[in-house]
Amino acid sequence: MAEVIAQLEKQLESERKELAYARLKIQVLEERLRQQRIAQYGPGSETLSNLQLELLDEEPAVNRDEVQAQSERGPGAPSPATSEKKHRAPHPGRQSLPAHLPRVDKVVACAPSQCVCTCCGGETTVIGYEISEVLDVKPAEYFVELTKREKRACKKCEEQGVAAAPLTARIIDKSLVSDRVIIDTLVRKYADHCPLYRQSSILKRDTGIEISRGTMCGWIMRVGDLLIPVASAMRSELLAGNYIQADETPVDVQTHDGRGTNHQAYLWQYGTPGGATVFNFRMSRGREGPAHFLDRFEGILQTDAYAAYDRGVGGVNIVHACCWAHARRRFVDAVKLNKRDVASIRAVELMDELFAIDAQARDDNMDHAGRHALRQQKAPPLLDQIRGHILEMSKTVLPKSAAGQASSYTLAIWTRLTRFLDYPELELSNNLAENSMRPIALGRSNWIHIGSEDAGPRIAAIFSVVESCRRLNIPVRDYLAAILPGLANAPLQRTAELTPAAWAARRPHLSTVGLL
């Protein structure tokens, strides 16, 4: 009998373990399902809800009002713990229109009855105007440009022949359209995300001229070819610095294998805060992409901890750093899956205090030295608190749950997350790199895919120039109009002088209005 009881107890214990495992598995699967639904249907906000804030009322050392205010501001904004409360400024009133815009007078005359004095019956005199301004627009106006090259000859010396003015350098020789039309087409596609089929339809509607998408695509590819050497020079500029932020995003590339499928390629983005950004097209997300681009780079490389950026990338003195926004986002995702996850809410609140330190430095217009001193004063005790909290979390949450994965991710890259203590130029987040990816994300929903693998490097060069001009406040149309004809007709060896940064440096009074 005792043997039977022991066997039954052993079987019961085994079934209990199986049941516990099944429950944990169900919990993880439910969490993943909820995560998919949130990604598909839920809001993109990373703020905390009222219910989540109520849970913090019982949490020691957590002030609900501070969390509410900081959550609404988002990462990077100062919190009451790190900056004085600022009073809301009065509303500035109606926005004034920029002085650089031309003014066109529109005179509104008085009615005939107002032109006669009601007292004596005499004619009144204009003594001034009541002036108001509104922003107006003139739709794109197409016209035909007649280029007349002067021909000269000596009537006395007919044997000397005729001399004609030289041809004007153009992006595409003998093209039906001017350089301005080609540049406008490119900017509309890659800055305004208007696909070529839509531009072709608009052109036909407004002018009656039908230019096929294939012809427009040829213009784009020609410009891409011309800009590849410029993008290469931009890469050299970037590698000569000591700080690069990197990220990557997928793009579909049309295949021509007869199956009608697309291949998922990647645009890798490399940039520096306050400077240019360079895109590199690769057919895969493998390590060979950053290994080739960052060959022999010596400096700080800030990424999201994707493994492809690690082994064999850069020079021997490369310093790897990671992004606090990525770590924070994982805890925010955990809160979205479990709105009563007090531990994850607390982790988000602590990270917001960390971002508030740098926000205070920005508000006070501190240089790197000032920010470094502020970080050294306020960040170390806060980092100890964050790490201790996450270590305690990791002991109580399921390893495969969102909170467990957020904890594991943050602890695994902790050394890289805290590099900012030693390098004052290092930003807390990689958000600037992510922001440079937004035009591609917007464009994907409009132009769908890249036409071929050969087109990839050309598109990457175009994105490099367009996005760098945006980041550097350079009017991209003026820039392209200045460099493309010369590149097309007399390719220069000194392409380093044609990068957006170098071009703008020679124009210190360059207007930063009308950038596109």
Map each language-model feature to its residues:
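Short, flexible loop/hinge motifs at secondary-structure junctions
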Residues: 1-173, 216, 245-246, 252, ...
